[in-house]
């Protein structure tokens, strides 16, 4: 997981999907669609927090990672007919959004939601959801391997 757009709004009010056991474990960054082989976060351990939530513990970072925390809560949700991993930073109550494009065996491909929150008039959760539903923009794809 890189440094995607962060928002004080979320795509959904609560998790809409149960834990996907295939996501549990240690994931290492293997590259992205920009042919970069380093990321803000290079390894993360995903554990089960509850029946609908994960705990993400960042275990390996690059020198450009400026964390407010190394531990996040996350959950899965269906939004706009897509499966999302929504990651919450409880320290500053912001959310990050990753579209799950592929999860098979020990391979995961995610796409970061890319919205310029400063240039858009997004001042409510309804406006945020409408914007993402109407014209989502995905930043880079990143590829991860489960250890």
What spans do the regions from the language model cover?
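Short edge beta-strand/loop segments characteristic of extracellular beta-sandwich folds
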Residues: 28-30
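Calycin-type beta-barrel ligand-binding domains and close structural analogs
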Residues: 4-20, 32-41, 48-147
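A glycine-anchored, Pro-Gly-centered beta-turn/N-cap motif
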Residues: 21-26
């Amino acid at each position: 997981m890189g440094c995607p757009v962060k928002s004080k709004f979320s795509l959904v009010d609560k998790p809409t999907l149960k834990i996907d056991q295939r996501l549990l474990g240690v994931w290492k960054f293997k590259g992205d669609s920009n042919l970069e082989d380093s990321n803000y976060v290079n390894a993360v351990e995903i554990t089960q927090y509850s029946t609908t939530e994960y705990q993400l513990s960042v275990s390996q970072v690059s020198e450009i990672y400026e964390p407010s925390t190394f531990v996040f809560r996350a959950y899965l949700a269906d939004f706009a007919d897509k499966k999302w991993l929504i990651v919450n930073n409880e320290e500053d109550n912001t959310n990050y959004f990753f579209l799950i494009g592929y999860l098979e065996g020990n391979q995961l491909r995610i796409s970061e939601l890319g919205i310029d929150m400063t240039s858009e008039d997004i001042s409510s959760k309804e406006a945020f959801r409408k914007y993402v539903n109407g014209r989502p923009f995905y930043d880079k794809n990143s590829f991860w391997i489960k250890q």
